């Protein structure tokens, strides 16, 4: 999949390290790119950039394995809301009140769903206008199986950075040796992080 991405991009693979998320969005908005991998949170920026619901859709990423006819979208997050138990009690309560407001009030759920593009899985949440959220919901209702993002099982940010660096080096110079370095960053890096966490 990585080779498919980097060798069919809007730029030379050697230049990918200098590209940003803004570059990718702008290439999509300016019709230089047909595909743009991102999430529901990107919807508002695409609409503000001039696209309409008729201009876009979301598709599962197919890998050619398993029962992909029943595959849904990749869903999840790598972030969580946390409250620092060491903070002042008044700050803790204010934070909890704000979090409650975000997911229970009309204004909060509208902001979360429409302005931020988040899927709000709470009973009091308003129906989102976000096309991507609607498409994900429809796929799930149609019996498609979402592909979970399991970020919480990744060993660390350091591990992600190591794999990312190896992938960047491979994109710039697509040799077997550089691909072996990607495999090593993934496998050996995971083993090292596991050892650090469990010894």
What is the predicted role of each segment?
Residues 8-10, 49-116:
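Extracytoplasmic/periplasmic substrate-recognition and gating elements
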Residues 15-29:
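Short helix-initiation/N-cap motifs at beta->coil->alpha
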Residues 21, 38-43, 77-79:
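Beta->alpha turn/N-cap motifs
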Residues 30-38:
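Alpha-to-beta junction loops
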Residues 43-50, 191-194:
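Pocket-flanking alpha-helical
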Residues 141-199:
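Conserved C-terminal helix/tail region of periplasmic/extracytoplasmic solute-binding proteins
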């Amino acid at each position: 999949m990585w080779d498919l991405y980097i060798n069919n991009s809007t730029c030379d693979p050697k230049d990918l390290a200098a590209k940003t998320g803004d570059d990718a969005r702008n290439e999509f908005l300016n019709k230089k790119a047909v595909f743009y991998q991102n999430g529901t949170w990107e919807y508002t920026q695409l609409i503000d950039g001039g696209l309409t619901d008729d201009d876009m859709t979301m598709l599962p990423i197919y890998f050619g394995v398993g029962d992909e006819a029943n595959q849904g979208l990749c869903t999840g997050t790598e972030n969580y809301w946390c409250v620092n138990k060491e903070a002042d009690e008044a700050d803790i309560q204010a934070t909890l009140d704000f979090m409650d407001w975000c997911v229970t009030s009309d204004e909060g759920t509208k902001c979360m769903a429409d302005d931020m593009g988040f899927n709000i899985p709470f009973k009091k949440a308003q129906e989102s206008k976000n096309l991507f959220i609607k498409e994900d919901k429809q796929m799930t209702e149609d019996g498609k199986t979402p592909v979970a993002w399991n970020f919480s099982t990744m060993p660390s940010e350091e591990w992600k950075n190591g794999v990312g660096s190896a992938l960047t080096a491979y994109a710039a110079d697509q040799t077997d040796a550089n691909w072996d370095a990607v495999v090593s960053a993934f496998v050996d890096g995971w083993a090292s992080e596991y050892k650090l966490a469990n010894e």
